[in-house]
Design a protein with these regions (language model features):
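Active-site-proximal specificity loops/subdomain of glycosyltransferases
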Residues: 65-82, 89-167
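Structural motif
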Residues: 29-34, 58-62, 176
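C-terminal catalytic/acceptor-binding lobe
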Residues: 253-321
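Conserved catalytic core of nucleotide-sugar-dependent glycosyltransferases
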Residues: 179-269
Length: 321
């Protein structure tokens, strides 16, 4: 077995490396308010992966879920309030648990709920980052419709991962609007064969993002001091689907505690390259697989009907239905 010294750094905790026999994987779907179709895909993923003992989780960001204001109409009418029908005003948590009830009951899917405050309590640097001028100028944050979890995936993921009693050796992270035109067991087998035990598997890693990239200045002071804050030192990648090793997630956790963070599209690949973690390109990408990609329900039905050829066993983003 590899020496534990290979898994430690001078300012990181003594994390025990995964045992040679521990090849446990988990797949986490990042959600905020998933559609019925997205929940159906999550259930199908759990069915596909149950035989190979991959733990499937839903990581649900519950920030900015509006509470229903009390109705004044019954008071004005001097009448008792009507009982609400059960189908009315379900929260995302209720919708997730209802749609996946049978999977949850048999342990095929587990749910982790958190919000922005949980992230800030775990990583106090995020309180300062939320006041970043560039972040506050963005449409998403100026309207107050998005939480930090939308752009700081590493901390959102580690809020879940660092509290597990038994950590899996590798964690897949899927956005809930990703589709795979085949069995996810096939994807995991392809990655094991082609990428081995890489610490980070991600798509389209690039050095030097455009200076016009909106999120370039969204970083902590400690990040700039350690890695630089200009485009010549920064890597970016698409994060719709990624796989992390235990030791890489633990390292990201330590750095966040040390106030080293930035927008996660840049944070994850920049640290991986700067600190010599193993990085591999995510295979089996379909078209589209991009932040502005769109796949309709009709198109997805056609893609998944193609059981052979160039559309089979590929990842697509984004399934906006």
């Amino acid at each position: 077995m590899a020496s534990i010294l290979q898994y430690m750094r001078t300012d990181s905790p003594a994390t025990v490396p995964p045992a040679d026999t521990n090849d446990a994987h988990a797949l986490v779907f990042r959600c905020h308010d998933p559609t019925p179709a997205a929940l159906q895909r999550i259930g199908e993923a759990a069915d596909q992966l149950q035989a190979c003992r991959v733990a499937v989780w839903v990581s649900l960001d519950t920030t900015h879920i509006p509470e229903e204001p009390p109705s004044l109409l019954p008071i004005l009418q001097h009448s008792p309030p009507r009982k609400k029908r059960r189908s009315e005003h379900r929260t995302p948590s209720q919708k997730v648990r209802r749609a996946l009830a049978t999977h949850i009951a048999r342990g095929a899917v587990q749910i982790h709920e958190y919000d922005e405050n949980d992230m800030i309590r775990t990583y106090p640097v995020l309180r300062d980052l939320k006041r970043n001028a560039r972040l506050q100028e963005s449409v998403e944050f100026s309207r107050g419709t998005h939480s930090l979890a939308w752009g700081l995936h590493a901390e959102a993921l580690n809020v879940w991962y660092q509290h597990l009693e038994r950590k899996p050796s590798f964690v897949w992270c899927f956005e809930d609007d990703v589709g795979f035109s085949g069995s996810l067991e096939t994807l995991l087998d392809i990655v094991r064969r082609d990428c081995g035990d890489a610490d980070l598997i991600t798509a389209d890693v690039k050095l030097r993002p455009s200076e016009a990239w909106w999120w370039l200045e969204v970083h902590s002071t400690a990040f700039a001091e350690r890695y630089g804050n200009d485009v010549h030192n920064i890597y970016v990648s698409r994060e719709h689907v990624q796989r992390f090793s235990m030791r890489f997630l633990d390292r990201l956790h330590v750095l966040s505690l040390q106030r080293v963070t930035c927008w996660s599209e840049a944070l994850v690949p920049t640290i991986a390259h700067a600190e010599n973690f193993g990085v591999a390109e995510l295979p089996r990408l379909g078209t589209p697989f991009a932040h502005d990609g769109r796949v309709t329900a009709q198109e997805w039905e056609h893609i998944t009907a193609s059981r052979a050829g160039r559309r089979a066993d590929r990842l697509y983003h984004a399934l906006k239905f």
